[in-house]
């Protein structure tokens, strides 16, 4: 992606301390100094654990991937505590440059749905939701085309507008996920109720229709920019790093080396 470069390192583990009670099956996501991490529990007691980081942080690695993953997770004391008795079941794997978006979504005789058109950083686990909705909207376009309906052009434009709206809405939040201003707002207990409901609505996938939550989300963005400017030096530093990462292409990741090129 030209706007958001990311790299990920992940593995499966056993022995990771799980949450208890009603939270037992919940996914954990936590901010780190150099990105964020996930913990996804499986029914058999194992867990997927990984980190998403800036490409330049991955380039700085001087240890094997397994050790690099564990060292990065230690940036969060609560996560490190849950990993104390963890045992890897698979070698750590690295992936980079996984966010992308095509320039065109449809054309004469074709349209792209799901990952065929775009893949965004899975901060909010939005991939399946975006794919299913684009598939449903795309089916209406195909139906109109096969019937020779005069609505074909209108439905095709509607398909593109809705899918791009959903991706753009998620992307705005994803691109700012590691910004200090965003983190302060996202976890603030002092958010107005309407803005909090709007954020929860977004996380639930309400990103396509003309929802009544769109104005509160707009207010969230306004407040974000105000908070950004109040601490502009730190926020600008993080923003510059993100932009620099979007220009770095990691071409190969081995156990001890990272090869890269800059656009």
Report the location of each language-model feature.
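Predominantly flavin-linked oxidoreductase catalytic cores and closely associated redox partners
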Residues: 1-85
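C-terminal helical "tail/cap" subdomain of flavin- and related membrane-associated enzymes
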Residues: 140-263
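Short hydrophobic/aromatic-rich motifs at helix boundaries and adjacent loops
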Residues: 41-43, 110-114, 170-171
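Charged, low-complexity, helix/coiled-coil-prone segments
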Residues: 4-19, 71-86, 100-107, 137-141, ...
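FAD/FMN-dependent oxidoreductases across multiple families
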Residues: 57-141, 147, 153-158, 165
């Amino acid at each position: 992606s030209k706007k958001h470069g990311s790299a990920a390192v992940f593995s499966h583990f056993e022995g990771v301390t799980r949450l208890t009670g009603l939270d037992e099956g919940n996914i954990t996501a936590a901010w780190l100094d150099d990105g964020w991490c996930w913990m996804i529990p499986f029914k058999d007691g194992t867990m997927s654990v990984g980190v998403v980081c800036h490409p330049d942080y991955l380039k700085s690695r001087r240890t094997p991937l397994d050790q690099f993953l564990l060292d990065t997770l230690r940036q969060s004391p609560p996560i490190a505590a849950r990993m104390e008795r963890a045992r890897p079941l698979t070698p750590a794997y690295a992936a980079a440059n996984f966010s992308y978006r095509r320039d065109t979504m449809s054309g004469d005789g074709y349209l792209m749905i799901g990952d065929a058109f775009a893949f965004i950083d899975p901060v909010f686990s939005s991939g399946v939701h975006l794919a299913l909705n684009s598939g449903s909207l795309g089916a209406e376009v195909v139906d109109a085309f096969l019937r020779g309906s005069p609505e074909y052009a209108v439905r095709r434009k509607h398909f593109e507008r809705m899918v791009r709206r959903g991706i753009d809405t998620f992307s705005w939040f994803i691109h700012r996920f590691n910004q200090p201003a965003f983190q302060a707002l996202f976890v603030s207990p002092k958010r107005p109720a309407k803005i909090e409901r709007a954020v929860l609505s977004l996380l639930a996938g309400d990103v396509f229709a003309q929802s009544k939550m769109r104005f509160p989300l707009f207010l969230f963005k306004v407040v974000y920019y105000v908070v950004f400017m109040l601490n502009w030096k730190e926020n600008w530093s993080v923003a510059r790093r993100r932009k620099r990462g979007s220009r770095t292409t990691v071409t190969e990741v081995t156990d001890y080396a990272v090869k890269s090129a800059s656009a």
